[in-house]
Amino acid sequence: MRVSVSGPAAAAVPTAGREPSTSGGGAVAASGAAVPGSVQLALSVLHALLYAALFAFAYLQLWRLLLYRERRLSYQSLCLFLCLAWAALRTTLFSAAFSLSGSLPLLRPPSRLHFFPHWLLYCFPSCLQFSTLCLLNLYLAEVICKVRCATELDKHKILLHLGFILASLLFLAVNLTCAMLVHGDVPENQLKWTVFIRALINDSLFILCAISLVSYICKITKMSSANVYLESKGMSLCQTVIVGSVVILLYSSRACYNLVVITISQDTLESPFNYGWDNLSDKAQGEDGNGGDYIVFGMVLFLWEHVPAWSVVLFFRAQRLNQNLAPAGMISSHSYSSRAFFFDNPRRYDSDDDLPRLGNSREGSLSNSQTLGWYGTMTGCGGGTYTVTPPLNGPVTDTAPLLFTCSNLDIRNHHSLYVTPQN
């Protein structure tokens, strides 16, 4: 979570018996004192349950992907796995926060916490969020390439993948380097510039990825066949636009807000609303935020973390795809139909690998009806019925459509024509 809120909150040095400093004067302090600790504990339990529910839902979707025999390595599975790891870290943080007699020691990083668990619980989830945003960009770019079927787009796909991979690695490197500097013995003036550079680079990357996501969504909305492709994947154009808009709005607004706040308040290290999650400072962790600050922190946490994460998981949820794409304007190349096709045979583009499978599937019908692919004669019988008698030793040929219906035949005549297969 990377949230900053402006205010004259000063960085306090841990001192025994010192009252916690708050921002906004006595009004905020009075509102914070009016909130009992049970309310803070209830909010912590609520957030922990929401994160645990997201973890369970993402875990279920990954199992459903295996059950439906989908590709194990895809944009869908990677996004679900990243959301699963992010929810697991957040659930661990909040579970430890309300487990110690109702106190909230881990929502504000303790000064004695080792570097790696400190970075893993408070810093690494933002890296997972950025990687999820990059994967969403790559997925929409893949949709555009599939719909346009352009070879020049396939050439740029490698560069696009490399670009987003390098952006994710840069985000991770900056986050990790700044966390190491802050965790060490760094002077306070250098600490401020370290936090500022980290926020400038990371939030700028968030904004750039949001802009690229906007461009991809605009291109997809202009393609008439994009909805058909998305429906074949169990999605729709409307869902794509809604989820993309929510992610763009929330992530870009958070990044812009962090940049503005950290620019106008460089003289302070900590805001009462971020609980040390933004600046990674362990030099001012002796104070405890008041109840009012924690309530606002919980509201911001729900808006900027829960909503985009749930949107992405619901968008990439596992679905049993409908193989009948005729209502969407597509016909599966492996669909079977009993009627004869003259110009629109759906199997006319089948590859050679499909021929043995198709031949095996038709052996049963050949045993029941010997008229498949044979020249035969149709003779009139009484009652307006016809009997087809194939030659016993006739050659097997390709099937041909029946060009005439029974209404065009005279019952007294004897015709020799092709017979269509009847499955």
Swiss-Prot record:
Bilayer topology: Multi-pass membrane protein
Gene Ontology terms: cellular component: lysosomal membrane
Signal peptide region: none
Cell location: Lysosome membrane
Stretches assigned to coiled coil: none
Keyword set, alphabetical order: Lysosome, Membrane, Transmembrane, Transmembrane helix
Keyword Transmembrane helix: yes
Lumenal side of membrane: 1-42, 99-114, 183-193, 263-294
Top-rank lineage group of the source organism: Eukaryota
Keyword Iron-sulfur: no
Functional summary from the UniProt entry: Lysosomal integral membrane protein that may regulate MTORC1 complex translocation to lysosomes.
PANTHER family reported for this sequence: INTEGRAL MEMBRANE PROTEIN GPR137 (PTHR15146), INTEGRAL MEMBRANE PROTEIN GPR137C (PTHR15146:SF1)
Protein name: G protein-coupled receptor 137C
Species per Swiss-Prot/TrEMBL record: Mus musculus (Mouse)
Gene name of the encoded protein: Gpr137c
